[in-house]
Amino acid sequence: MQTTTTGTTLGTGTATGVGTTAGVRMRIIGRADSDSAGPGPELMAADTLEGDRVVNLNGEDLGKITDIMLDVQRGRIAYAVMSVGGFLGIGDKLFAVPWSAMSLDVDRKCFVLDANKDRLEAAPGFDKDSWPTMADPTWAQSVHEYYGSRPYWEEY
């Protein structure tokens, strides 16, 4: 993922780079300056993101966020787990998407992932009863490479 700075346009709205270190950041698309009281969109409770839609750059629905995975040792968000397909959690496939591979669109209230449906379906996924060992460096590196995202742990 390329970093952005305040004022860089991306699709619709304005993108604002957010994070504590340069390089790997979540992009926020939409309102450059929040006029609402409260913490968001720069600081949000993880459970408020669960259930959010994920769309691609063409606006096609890809899935929804089911979990936010934290790297507790580094104090970083590592992945968003996205559910694709199925009905009411039955028959869906899960994907761990590097946090830095997505953008948050506050105007449309969704995440944006630069991947078409075919690319996503070919991505390394898993089912709800067989999660990968996400702390495994080989697995983590391959997921970041698949999405073209710089690994968050390289920032420290």
Predicted ranges, named:
Residues 1-156:
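Peripheral interaction segments used for macromolecular assembly
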